[in-house]
Amino acid sequence: GEVVTITYPGYKPWSKKLSINAGDILKIPEIELVPADSIVDLSTMPSGATITINGEYRGNTPNTVYLDADKKHNISIFLNGYFTQKHSVLLASGKRKNLSLELIPSIGAVKVLVSPKDSTIWIDGKLLGITGEILQLPSRPHLMEIKNSGYVSYKKVITPQPQLEQIIKVQLLTKEEHYWASIPVEITSLGGQILKLFKPEGTFTMGAPRQEVGRRANEVLRKVKITRPFYLATKEVTNDQYWQYKQHSSRHAGGKTLDRPKQPVVSISWEQAALYCNWLSRKEKLLPFYIESANKITGSNISATGYRLPTEAEWAWAARSSGSDNQSENLHNNFPPKDKSGNFADISAANILESVIPIYNDGHSTTATVGSFNPNKKGLYDLDGNVAEWVNDYYGIRFNLGNTAEIDPMGPNEGELKVIRGGSWRHSDIAQLRLSFRDTGNSARDDVGFRVARYVESKDKKSR
């Protein structure tokens, strides 16, 4: 077969492949030629604009488009940051038109206010000004970057709006500030505990003055400064959280169960609490804080960021409503406390305990569900009651001679007893319910539990 093509001025070519045997006659029906298209060559400055014809997408500039002849066609040209251009064309068959357009920028005003004021503003990689200047920019997306020596650069995609001045305010952060802005202020452990981030500033005083009512000899005044930010659980570890680690019974007191899922776990030793912390660390693939050997705690790695018990200094700082208060918020200048302000030895426990707070009723004769009472000003629950709490430190009495603050104290390196802090459902005396009260022990008690803590970063991490 051969391809046969018929052409005629002003009409589209007609082509068809024809096959015929020798000696045969092939009859072809009458051929009606179709008028040729009109042609439009489209270009824009800048190029890359979108073309629509009669609402239908026809590519981007530069482009050549073919249109039905002798018909009106509506051409629209779009490009981000430029005004839309619209044109109508009507061309005879076979006619060609060149349409070259210079697009008009659509401008929006942007005022960028930055602290510090000597910061420079870069748009799409080009330096355009300093803070406070009004930038006139095409109304399309731009990458804005703000730079200043000693600060982390700020990047943001902005889209100016025509006839509308935008005001953008930016506070640049130092590397240190940027780092801490990226650290979550609250985390949830795989054990179910919610922990809050704390970054204590300045120094505070542990202990109590000699004249304070209820003060004991081991509450020596000492200045302390905590420099390592840490996470601290908002609530005490519950029975059901501890059961994830191992089987355990918190038992009962006076015929009342201490073993409900949301009651704080009790009747565990300091070592059992530390082993739980290591289990939780391994569960989250964190370096354990406590050193173990044959299921015994033999030491600690103070550079580790795994879970641990709070240090006595951390506990004391977290429990205070201010830097110097030695009484809980519930008991400050108010003893006996108001009803249901915390879980202490109340009249509902009179059949269980020898001593209770007269005319005080918190509604719980033994341990309460954790978080049953209002938190302190730092958002922490039950620091002054419910159960007393194991802390990390060995017990000791340290005299702070002079005016120098101890930095991140962790207690003696060794000892026989561990420190217990906070009041409990068994405590009725104001001496035991003050925040400076220090108890000691090693063995399990039915009014002692714990809460978990962890450092944010290792001790040897270099400053940013």
Regions found by a protein language model. Give the residues of each.
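Short coil/loop residues immediately preceding or within conserved phosphate-binding loops
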Residues: 37, 107, 132, 141, ...
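Functional-site microenvironments in short loops/helix caps that host divalent-cation chemistry
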Residues: 205, 209-214, 259, 270-438, ...
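Surface-exposed aromatic
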Residues: 257-266
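Short, structured beta-strand segments at or near domain termini in extracellular proteins/domains
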Residues: 446-464
